[in-house]
């Protein structure tokens, strides 16, 4: 008996690392110290001395059961983008700049080419976020997971000067809410998605005129990364008052997380066009409206609270970053929460 016969292929692990090296190298920043393969990733903080009071920020998350679609479609090149997005978008909600990222893949069996493809997606997410992929782990779990399946999670660290920290504490009645478009379902609510739609290769490869693509393409579209967007807003000289990443729990759970006591967010549902994938989900799954807005992002991946005087500047900055903004509502006095009207 040896380790390979028990289900763990060390040589496959070595091959995976070799295949992913170029992708990982493409994410490096000058602050990264050392090469690939060390016991820990090293990142110099010398540059943050320029900040008055640097604050480190962290975020960790995964892709949930969205990975099931990747298994069925045998498409693994974008799921890594989702893992990065879920973490760095949380970091930018506090006004931070992502510095580095680490990934964790647990798999039933290490197929080097597949693992390298997944990490290639992670690297792409890191490039979009301008953060370095400085470490990771691929763990083979024979007997615990099916051979063809895996789970993917990540961890991001960022930094912000304390004076630039977005806390939401200064949000007040009269402030404007700006929503930034999502790419679709992003990485939340997929357990419900998988209950609504038949999850077979045939069904996912079915083209729908209403979507302008196949169902699988619509669902597997990678989560938007809003790092560049927030940098553009900051470069424009605007201090965002509050920022919410619309993930699991939708508007109802996430928008209140940025609000102080005594104010509520009033969001106008007709202020933007809800993408067709959500309409299809609601109709095919007979899902009530409140549940839709309490589960999915409904086409809005990020919600900002800004001073009315800054609205035009923020809208232009978001567009300059290549994203689509909408004025979706305002802040009113009342019990902390969200009202959709």
From Swiss-Prot:
Any single GO BP term: 'de novo' IMP biosynthetic process
Keywords: ATP-binding, Cytoplasm, Ligase, Nucleotide-binding, Purine biosynthesis
One Pfam family recorded for the sequence: AIRS
Highest taxon of the lineage: Bacteria
GO MF, any single term: ATP binding
Keyword Transmembrane helix: no
Pathway: Purine metabolism; IMP biosynthesis via de novo pathway; 5-amino-1-(5-phospho-D-ribosyl)imidazole from N(2)-formyl-N(1)-(5-phospho-D-ribosyl)glycinamide: step 2/2
Subcellular location as annotated: Cytoplasm
Catalytic activity line of the entry: 2-formamido-N(1)-(5-O-phospho-beta-D-ribosyl)acetamidine + ATP = 5-amino-1-(5-phospho-beta-D-ribosyl)imidazole + ADP + phosphate + H(+)
Predominant location: cytoplasm
EC numbers on record: 6.3.3.1
GO cellular component, one term: cytosol
Family: Belongs to the AIR synthase family.
HAMAP family (UniProt xref): AIRS (MF_00741)
Name of the protein described by the UniProt record: Phosphoribosylformylglycinamidine cyclo-ligase
